[in-house]
C-alpha cells in the first residue's frame, strides 16, 4: 500500500558518508570503450537529439562499466557498457519521463518478444527493441544458455517493474517501505547487470551455485546497497521530478515522518548494514571452493565500489547539485 500525501522539508541537505570496504579499480580499456559505447548509442537512435547526445557524452558512461567490471576483456566490457547505456536510455525515455503506466505497458510486447525469441510476424522496428535484440545476440555468443536465460528472466522483471513505478507517478502515490524495498530490487535493474558478471569474468556459475542460499543473500544485499546509494546520490536529480515518490528518501520521510536529512542518515545506516551482511556471508561462499562463485562475489563488490566512485563524479548526478539547492557531499 502507499499514500498520496506529501511533506515540505528543511534545507540544505548533506549526503551521509558512503564507506566502502571493497577494492576500487578501473578497466584498462576504459577510454576506448567509453568512445565505442557512445558511438553505438548514437547509431541505435535511442537518443532523440544532439543535446541529449552531448549530455550522454559528458556523463562518460563507459567509466561506470570500467569501474564495475574492471576485470572484463575488451569485448565483454563493450557488452556490459552497451547494456548499461541501454538501461540509462530506457530509464530516461520511459521511467524519468511523464509517460503513463499504460504507455509503458504497451511498449512491453515487442521487448518481451525479443527476449523470448518469439516471431512477432513483422520486423522489429522499435529502436529499444532493436538494440535489445543486438545485445541479446552478444550475450548468447559470449555466454551459455543458462547465462542467457538468467539475464532475460531478470530483464523481463525489470521491464514489468517500470509499470509499477509509472503507476505510482500517475496516481501520486508514495509506496510503503515494504513495497518499495521489494520493488526497488527490480526497478533498479541491478539483477540484470549482476547476471552478466559471470559472462564478463569468463567463469560460468552452475545452476546450483546461482541458487545457493548464500549467493541469493549476498546478491540481495549488494542489490540493496547499490540502489539505496543511487537513491541518495540521485536525489537532487529526482527530487523535483514526477519520479521523486519512487525514491527511498521520500518513502522514509512520508511513512516515518522524517525530515529529508533524517531519511538520508537512516539510508546511510541501512546500506552500511547491508554491506556488513555481505562481509558476513562471504566466508561461507569461499568455503564452496568455486572460482566462479568467488569471481561473482568480487564482481558484486566491484559494483558497490565502482558505482559510488562513478556516481560521485558523473555529470548525470553532479549537475543537479549545481543547479538546485539540493544535497551536497559531506
From Swiss-Prot:
Keyword Magnesium among record annotations: yes
A molecular-function term among this protein's GO annotations: metal ion binding
Annotated metabolic or biological route of this protein: Secondary metabolite biosynthesis; terpenoid biosynthesis
Disulphide bridges: none
Sorted UniProt keywords: Lyase, Magnesium, Metal-binding
Segments crossing the lipid bilayer: none
Site (Plays a critical role for substrate recognition): 92, 165
InterPro entries found in the cross-reference section: epi-cubol_syn (IPR054966), Isoprenoid_synthase_dom_sf (IPR008949), Terpene_cyclase-like_2 (IPR034686)
Binding residue positions for substrate: 184, 237, 316-317
Swiss-Prot/TrEMBL site (Plays a critical role in the stabilization of intermediate cation) positions: 88
A GO BP entry: terpenoid biosynthetic process
Ligand binding (Mg(2+) 2): 96
Stretches assigned to coiled coil: none
Residues at which Mg(2+) 1 binds: 91, 96
Domain notes per entry: The Asp-Asp-Xaa-Xaa-Xaa-Glu (DDXXXE) motif is important for the catalytic activity, presumably through binding to Mg(2+).
Function: Catalyzes the conversion of (2E,6E)-farnesyl diphosphate (FPP) to yield the bicyclic sesquiterpenol 4-epi-cubebol via a 1,10-cyclization, which requires the abstraction of the pyrophosphate from FPP to yield a (E,E)-germacradienyl cation. The only accepted substrate is (2E,6E)-farnesyl diphosphate (FPP).
Protein name in the entry: 4-epi-cubebol synthase ((2E,6E)-farnesyl diphosphate cyclizing)
Organism: Streptosporangium roseum (strain ATCC 12428 / DSM 43021 / JCM 3005 / KCTC 9067 / NCIMB 10171 / NRRL 2505 / NI 9100)
Amino acid at each position: 500500500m502507499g499514500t498520496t500525501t506529501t511533506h515540505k522539508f528543511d534545507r540544505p541537505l548533506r549526503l551521509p558518508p558512503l564507506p566502502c570496504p571493497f577494492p576500487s579499480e578501473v578497466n584498462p580499456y576504459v577510454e576506448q570503450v567509453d568512445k565505442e559505447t557512445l558511438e553505438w548509442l548514437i547509431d541505435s537512435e535511442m537518443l532523440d537529439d544532439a543535446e541529449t547526445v552531448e549530455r550522454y557524452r559528458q556523463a562518460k558512461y563507459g567509466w561506470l562499466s570500467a569501474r564495475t567490471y574492471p576485470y572484463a576483456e575488451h569485448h565483454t566490457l563493450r557488452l556490459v557498457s552497451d547494456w548499461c547505456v541501454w538501461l540509462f536510455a530506457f530509464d530516461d525515455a520511459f521511467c524519468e519521463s511523464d509517460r503513463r503506466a499504460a504507455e509503458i505497458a504497451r511498449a512491453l510486447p515487442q521487448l518481451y518478444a525479443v527476449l523470448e525469441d518469439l516471431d512477432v510476424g513483422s520486423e522489429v522496428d522499435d529502436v529499444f527493441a532493436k538494440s535489445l535484440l543486438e545485445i541479446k545476440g552478444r550475450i548468447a555468443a559470449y555466454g551459455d544458455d543458462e547465462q542467457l536465460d538468467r539475464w532475460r528472466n531478470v530483464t523481463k522483471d525489470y521491464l514489468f517493474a517500470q509499470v509499477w513505478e509509472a503507476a505510482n507517478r500517475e496516481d501520486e502515490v508514495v509506496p510503503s517501505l515494504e513495497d518499495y524495498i521489494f520493488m526497488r530490487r527490480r526497478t533498479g535493474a541491478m539483477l540484470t547487470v549482476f547476471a552478466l558478471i559471470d559472462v564478463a569474468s569468463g567463469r560460468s556459475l552452475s545452476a546450483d551455485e546461482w541458487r545457493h542460499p548464500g549467493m541469493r543473500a549476498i546478491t540481495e544485499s549488494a542489490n540493496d546497497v547499490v540502489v539505496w546509494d543511487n537513491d541518495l546520490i540521485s536525489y537532487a536529480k529526482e527530487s523535483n521530478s514526477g519520479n521523486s515518490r519512487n525514491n527511498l528518501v521520500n518513502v522514509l520521510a512520508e511513512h516515518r515522518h522524517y525530515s529529508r536529512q533524517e531519511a538520508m542518515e537512516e539510508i546511510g545506516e541501512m546500506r552500511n548494514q547491508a554491506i556488513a551482511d555481505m562481509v558476513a556471508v562471504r566466508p561461507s561462499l569461499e568455503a564452496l571452493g568455486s572460482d566462479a562463485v568467488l569471481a561473482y562475489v568480487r564482481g558484486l563488490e566491484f559494483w558497490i565500489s565502482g558505482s559510488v566512485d562513478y556516481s560521485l563524479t558523473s555529470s548525470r548526478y553532479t549537475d543537479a547539485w549545481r543547479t538546485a539547492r539540493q544535497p551536497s557531499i559531506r
